[in-house]
């Protein structure tokens, strides 16, 4: 399970690495899609916390 969550984290990270600079470089794109990127950032942070919690539980067993 932790491996799948880590793979999802890597995919979200790669998506943000590619799309955020493109949105910032395109005139007006950041303002239009700012809420979508905010949701992506929130999902990334939440996934980091879930992976940390899952790893903590798995290592204590």
From Swiss-Prot:
UniProt-listed Pfam families: Ycf9
Compartmental location: Plastid, Chloroplast thylakoid membrane
Main location as per UniProt: plastid
Membrane topology: Multi-pass membrane protein
InterPro entries tied to this protein: PSII_PsbZ, PSII_PsbZ_sf
GO cellular component, one term: chloroplast thylakoid membrane
Gene Ontology terms: biological process: photosynthesis; photosystem II stabilization
Transmembrane segments: 5-25, 38-58
Keywords noted in UniProt: Chloroplast, Membrane, Photosynthesis, Photosystem II, Plastid, Reaction center, Thylakoid, Transmembrane, Transmembrane helix
Entry similarity comment: Belongs to the PsbZ family.
Function: May control the interaction of photosystem II (PSII) cores with the light-harvesting antenna, regulates electron flow through the 2 photosystem reaction centers. PSII is a light-driven water plastoquinone oxidoreductase, using light energy to abstract electrons from H(2)O, generating a proton gradient subsequently used for ATP formation.
Subunit structure: PSII is composed of 1 copy each of membrane proteins PsbA, PsbB, PsbC, PsbD, PsbE, PsbF, PsbH, PsbI, PsbJ, PsbK, PsbL, PsbM, PsbT, PsbX, PsbY, PsbZ, Psb30/Ycf12, at least 3 peripheral proteins of the oxygen-evolving complex and a large number of cofactors. It forms dimeric complexes.
Protein name, as recorded: Photosystem II reaction center protein Z
Organism of this sequence: Phaeodactylum tricornutum (strain CCAP 1055/1)
């Amino acid at each position: 399970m932790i491996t799948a969550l880590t793979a999802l984290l890597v995919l979200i990270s790669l998506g943000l690495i590619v799309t955020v600079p493109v949105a910032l470089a395109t005139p007006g794109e950041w303002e239009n899609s700012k809420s979508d990127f905010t949701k992506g950032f929130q999902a990334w942070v939440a996934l980091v916390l879930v992976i940390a919690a899952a790893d903590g539980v798995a290592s204590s067993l």
